[in-house]
Every structure is written in structure tokens, then in C-alpha cells.
Amino acid sequence: MSVIFVIFIIIINILIILLSSIFIRNYLRGKKFKNQKYLSKETIILITGGCLGLGRELIHLLISLYNCKIINLDIRESEFHSMEELYNKNLKNIYCNIAKIKDIIKFLEENDVNINEIDLVINNAAIANNLPLEQLSLNNMISTIEINLLAPMKIIKSFIDYYNKNKNNQKQIHFVTLCSVMSHIISANSSDYITSKWGLFAFMESLRNEYLYNNKYIFTTICPFATNTGMFPNFIFCMDKKWVSKQILQSIVLKEQIKFIPDFINFPIYLYKFLPSCLSNLVQYYIINPFSKNLGRRIENDNLLK
């Protein structure tokens, strides 16, 4: 009994230290954020999938707080008019199926976008099926990988190649990629989505290390927990998208390398990885897997195969 009590006390102390450190870190982070002058009305931002969810919330914050100029690549033309009316000259919407574009630089130039003026690239567009493997078609799986993984890779690769060819252009460019906590917490019924996000996280981490001492390129990877954007409509614990978008904005302004949202999700992720397989299997079966039985945003319903 005394051993169990000691273990309990140790766990409580660890949790207190963890929560205290998160509170202090967020307090200092908030003060630093208020003093930063990174974004302004001169900042030009390229974002993918900005018509819905976190993308739309980010566009709202970037324009309302900093008066930034936004170029939004999306396929949802029905949203274009209302957004342009709301944000006037600060927003330019361009119809684009990012999964099918081979040369993003050429595409942007054809749409009268000056590549040299872009300061920030936000890879936000993503889809989720959330179906067991047996119910997934190959077309579904390929589309998920194309949109969630290959499209951000092609965009970043194209921009870096373009800037490397233009040696006279010494401006700094910041790549922000919205990944997911599910790149670290593996659940059932999401094999294609998790594969794409795991690969995307690895890609961003590899690039960050590749350009570690190159100040020309900045890489920020955002890993949020499930958010009420409609991608996981039946998920029980969804974070508020307005709050999440503010956390993402802080990470962008502070040029953070990796940001998990919420912060404390780090602790259970790494604790889970240290569990012996017999215990991790129990956690997986009774805690993680039941939460994955929800309907995601269907590719067919979103016309993402056009």
C-alpha cells in the first residue's frame, strides 16, 4: 500500500510541475507575442484551403489584427464572393486544386502573383476520411496523400528552388504547415490520414534540420488536437477553432519550430510511447480507438476530386 501511495505522490508532483511549467511558459510566450512586430500591412501571405475551418479563422485574424495581404488557394468558389466582400482588397481568392498543380510557381505567376513579394506560406488544406481500411477506396487513399502530404511538399520545394535560383533575393520566407497530433497518436480507422500527417511532420522536421543554420528559410510545424472545424464532426473532445487559430498565430509570430495544441498533449504522447506493449495495447484498444469511430469530411462531399 505504501508503494502505491509513493507512486501516486510522485505522479501528482510530476503533474504539478508539468502544469506549472506550461502556465509559466504560456505567460512568457504571451508577453513576447505582444512585443513582436513580425507581421504588418506590408506582409503578403499565401494560404491553402482558407475558405473553411482554421484557414478561414487565420485569414480573419491576420487581416483584422495586422491588415496583411492574403492570397487564398482553394476549390470552394461558392465562398469567394462573401470573403472578398468582407475583406475587400486584403484578400485575393484563386481557384486551385493543389493536388493537381505540378508547378505552383508557374500557376501563381499566371494568376498575377509576384512570388518575390510573398513572406509567409501556410500549408493548411487537408482532408480526412476516417474509415476502416476495408471501406477506403484506392482513390480515397491517393487523394488524401496528394492533398495532405504531396501538395505541401511540392509547394515548399517549388518556393525553395525558386528562391535559390534568384540569388539576388535575400528576403526571408517562412513556411508554416498545419500537421496534427495524430501524427504522434496513432488511432484506428484513420490509416490514410495518419500516414499523410506522420509523413508531413517528418518532412518538416527534416527540412528544419537541413536548413538549421540558413536564416533564409524558417519552418514551423503546428500539431493541433481535434478542432471543431467539421473535419471530425462526431468527435467528443473538439477544441474551439477560434482559440486554436490564436495559438497558431502566436506560433507564427514567434517563429516557433514545433507547436502542439494544447501544450500538455506532449506529456501523454511521450508517456504512451514509453509504456510496455501490453499496457500500450490496452490504452490503444480501450481509450484511443473508441474515439476514432467518427465520420470525417468526405472527399466526395467536398468535391475535392474535381
What are these regions (language model features)?
Residues R29-K69:
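Canonical Rossmann dinucleotide-binding motif of NAD(H)/NADP(H)-dependent dehydrogenases/reductases
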Residues N124-N130:
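Conserved NAD(P)H cofactor-binding loop of Rossmann-fold oxidoreductase domains
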Residues P132-L133, S137-I142:
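Substrate-binding pocket helix/loop in short-chain dehydrogenase/reductase
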Residues I156, S196:
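Active-site helix of classical SDR
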Residues S180:
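Residue(s) in the substrate-gating loop at a strand-loop-helix junction
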Residues I186-I194, S206, F235:
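Active-site loop-to-helix junction immediately N-terminal to the catalytic Tyr of the SDR YXXXK motif
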Residues T221, I236-Y270:
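C-terminal helical subdomain
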